[in-house]
C-alpha cells in the first residue's frame, strides 16, 4: 500500500531500523504539551465506557475559545474525518480545488464519485490563489475547498479575496470549505481567519485541528465551524457515532488551556522560518515565500532519497497535481534541527 502523506515514521523505522529526523510532517516541533499528556493519563479511567458522541464538554470549551455558539461546532477524528463527513453528507456532483493543495480533499470527493475540477496555481505567482480561482466557481460547482494557508505552498489567500469567494459560492449555490488547520501557527491569525464571515454565510464551513499546533497527530482531533446547524447535523450522521475518543476529548480541552505553549510555538516559527528559507536559498535552491510552518522548495529529484539514507525525511511533492518531481516541502522545526537539515543537505548537494 502506497501512502500519499508525509509523517510515515513507522514506514521509515521498518525500512531503516531507526527513527528519522522528520521534516515531512508539519506538526509543532516542541512536542506534546505536558498538560495534554497529563489530561490523557487522567482520562484513562473513562476508557471502559463509550465516549460522549456529542463532545459536550469539549464543544463548550471550544465555544469559549473560538467565541462562537456551541451549536456551530462539530468535533471529529481529525480534520480528515470532517472532510469525509462533509463530502458524504453533501454527495456533490462537481467540486473545485486549487492545484496544488492538500490531497485528502480529492480523495474524499472521489470516494462519492464526484468530478474534481482543479484550477492550476502558477509558479510565476509563487502558487498564490488569485481572482482566477474565484471566477472558476460557477453554477455547476457544488463544493469548493480552500486551504488557508495552502498546503504545500504556505501561501495565504488575502481576506478580501476570501470574502469574494464566499459571496461567489453563495451566488452559485456552492458550499465553501476554508481549511484553517495551519492558520493558528501564524501570529496574524486573527486578522486572517474567515470566522467573522460565518454569521452571514451559512454556506461556509471552517476546518480546524489540534493535530498540528499541539503536536497531537496521533490523538486525532479536529473540528468544524459552521452557522448552518442542519449541515453539521448531516455531517454528524454521515459517520460513526463515537468518532472522538474520550482520551482525545480530554486532550483537546487541556490543549485549549496551553496558551503559553501555543505562543511559544508561534514565536519559534516566526523566528525560524525566514532563517531556514535563507539557508535553503544559500544552497542555490528556489524557495516559495510562504507564511506557514513549512516551506516549499525545488531541488534535484534525487534529494529526498539521499536525505533518507542519512536519516532525514522531507515531503516529496511530486505527487501533488500542479507540481512536478523535484518540489519538496519541509517543516520548520527548532534551530538545531533546522541546522542539521541544512548541513545534511550541504553534504548531499556538494
Task: Please place each PLM-identified region on the residue numbering.
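N-terminal "arm"/small-domain region of PLP-dependent enzymes with the aminotransferase-like
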Residues: 1-49
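Conserved PLP-binding catalytic core of the aspartate aminotransferase-like
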Residues: 270, 280-311
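PLP-dependent aminotransferase class I/II
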Residues: 31-33, 54, 203-288
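Active-site phosphate-binding strand-loop segment of PLP-dependent enzymes
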Residues: 123-187
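Short loop-beta-helix segment that forms the pyridoxal 5′-phosphate
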Residues: 51, 63-85
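PLP-dependent aminotransferase-like
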Residues: 88-146
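Short acidic capping loops at alpha-helix termini that bridge into adjacent secondary structure
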Residues: 69-73, 180, 202-203
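PLP-dependent enzyme catalytic core of the Aspartate aminotransferase-like
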Residues: 309-310, 319-350
Amino acid at each position: 500500500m502506497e501512502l500519499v502523506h508525509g509523517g510515515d515514521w513507522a514506514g521509515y523505522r521498518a525500512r531503516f531500523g531507526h527513527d528519522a529526523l522528520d521534516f515531512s510532517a508539519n506538526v509543532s516541533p516542541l512536542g506534546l504539551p505536558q498538560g495534554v499528556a497529563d489530561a490523557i493519563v487522567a482520562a484513562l479511567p473513562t476508557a471502559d465506557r463509550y465516549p460522549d458522541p456529542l463532545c459536550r464538554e469539549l464543544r463548550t470549551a471550544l465555544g469559549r475559545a473560538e467565541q462562537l455558539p456551541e451549536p456551530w461546532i462539530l468535533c471529529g477524528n481529525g480534520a480528515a474525518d470532517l472532510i469525509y463527513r462533509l463530502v458524504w453528507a453533501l454527495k456533490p456532483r462537481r467540486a473545485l480545488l486549487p492545484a496544488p493543495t492538500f490531497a485528502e480533499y480529492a480523495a474524499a470527493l472521489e470516494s462519492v464519485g464526484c468530478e474534481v475540477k482543479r484550477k492550476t496555481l502558477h509558479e510565476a505567482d509563487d502558487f498564490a490563489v488569485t481572482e482566477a480561482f474565484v471566477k472558476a466557481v460557477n453554477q455547476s460547482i457544488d463544493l469548493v475547498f480552500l486551504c488557508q494557508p495552502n498546503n504545500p505552498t504556505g501561501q495565504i489567500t488575502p481576506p478580501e479575496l476570501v470574502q469574494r469567494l464566499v459571496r461567489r459560492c453563495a451566488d452559485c449555490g456552492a458550499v465553501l470549505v476554508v481549511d484553517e488547520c495551519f492558520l493558528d501557527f501564524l501570529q496574524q491569525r486573527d486578522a486572517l481567519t474567515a470566522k467573522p464571515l460565518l454569521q452571514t454565510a451559512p454556506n461556509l464551513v471552517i476546518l480546524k485541528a489540534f493535530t498540528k499546533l499541539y503536536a497531537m497527530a496521533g490523538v486525532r482531533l479536529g473540528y468544524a465551524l459552521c452557522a448552518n446547524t442542519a449541515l453539521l447535523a448531516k455531517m454528524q450522521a454521515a459517520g460513526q457515532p463515537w468518532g472522538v475518543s474520550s482520551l482525545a476529548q480530554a486532550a483537546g480541552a487541556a490543549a485549549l488551556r496551553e496558551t503559553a505553549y501555543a505562543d511559544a510555538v508561534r514565536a519559534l516559527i516566526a523566528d525560524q522560518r525566514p532563517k531556514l528559507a535563507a539557508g535553503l536559498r544559500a544552497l542555490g535552491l528556489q524557495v516559495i515565500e510562504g507564511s506557514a510552518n513549512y516551506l516549499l522548495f525545488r531541488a534535484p529529484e534525487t534529494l529526498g532519497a539521499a536525505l533518507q539514507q542519512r536519516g532525514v525525511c522531507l515531503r516529496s511533492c511530486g505527487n501533488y497535481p500542479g507540481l512536478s518531481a523535484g518540489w519538496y516541502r519541509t517543516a520548520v522545526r527548532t534551530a538545531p534541527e533546522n541546522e542539521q537539515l541544512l548541513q545534511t543537505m550541504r553534504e548531499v548537494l556538494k
